[in-house]
C-alpha cells in the first residue's frame, strides 16, 4: 500500500483575497435598503400578504374585545375568522414564493 503524499492545492491560497468556490458568485449589495424601502418593495411585489396580516390582527383584536365584554359567541366567531385569515395569509405567502420561483427560471 502506498501512503499518500502531501496534498498540494491547485491554486495557492492567499489570505488577502476571498476564497474561490466553484459555481458561486457572491454579490455585494452596494445600495442597502432601509426597512421602509424594503417593506414598500415587498408589499408591491405581493400585496395580498399585508392584507391577510391586517385581517388576522383585526379578527384577533375584535375577538379579544368581545371576550372581554362577555360576548362569547362573537368571540368564538372572531377566533375562527382569525384562523381563516391566518390560513389565507400562509396561502398567499406560499403562492408568492411559487410565483417568484417561476419568474426566476429562464
UniProtKB/Swiss-Prot annotation:
Positions of post-translational N-acetylalanine modification: 2
Mitochondrial matrix membrane side: 104-106
GO BP field: mitochondrial respirasome assembly; negative regulation of apoptotic process
Pfam families xref list: HIG_1_N
Segments traversing the membrane: 47-67, 83-103
Record's subcellular location: Mitochondrion membrane; Mitochondrion inner membrane
Membrane topology annotation: Multi-pass membrane protein
InterPro entries associated with the record: Hypoxia_induced_domain, RCF1
Cellular component aspect of the GO annotation: mitochondrial inner membrane; mitochondrion
Key words, A-Z: Acetylation, Electron transport, Membrane, Mitochondrion, Mitochondrion inner membrane, Respiratory chain, Transmembrane, Transmembrane helix, Transport
This protein's record includes keyword Acetylation: yes
Gene3D superfamilies: 6.10.140.1320
Domain HIG1: 20-106
DNA damage is among the record's keywords: no
PANTHER family, per database record: HIG1 DOMAIN FAMILY MEMBER 2A, MITOCHONDRIAL, HYPOXIA-INDUCBILE GENE 1 HIG1 -RELATED
Subunit (UniProt): Associates with cytochrome c oxidase (COX, complex IV); proposed complex component.
Function of the protein: Proposed subunit of cytochrome c oxidase (COX, complex IV), which is the terminal component of the mitochondrial respiratory chain that catalyzes the reduction of oxygen to water. May be involved in cytochrome c oxidase activity. May play a role in the assembly of respiratory supercomplexes.
Protein name from the UniProt record: HIG1 domain family member 2A, mitochondrial
Amino acid at each position: 500500500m502506498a501512503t499518500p503524499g502531501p496534498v498540494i492545492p491547485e491554486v495557492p491560497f492567499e489570505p488577502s483575497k476571498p476564497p474561490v468556490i466553484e459555481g458561486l458568485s457572491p454579490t455585494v449589495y452596494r445600495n442597502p435598503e432601509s426597512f421602509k424601502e424594503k417593506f414598500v418593495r415587498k408589499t408591491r411585489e405581493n400585496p395580498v400578504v399585508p392584507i391577510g396580516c391586517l385581517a388576522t390582527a383585526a379578527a384577533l383584536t375584535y375577538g379579544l374585545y368581545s371576550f372581554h365584554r362577555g360576548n362569547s359567541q362573537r368571540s368564538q366567531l372572531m377566533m375562527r375568522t382569525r384562523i381563516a385569515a391566518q390560513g389565507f395569509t400562509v396561502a398567499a405567502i406560499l403562492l408568492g414564493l411559487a410565483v417568484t420561483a417561476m419568474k426566476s427560471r429562464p
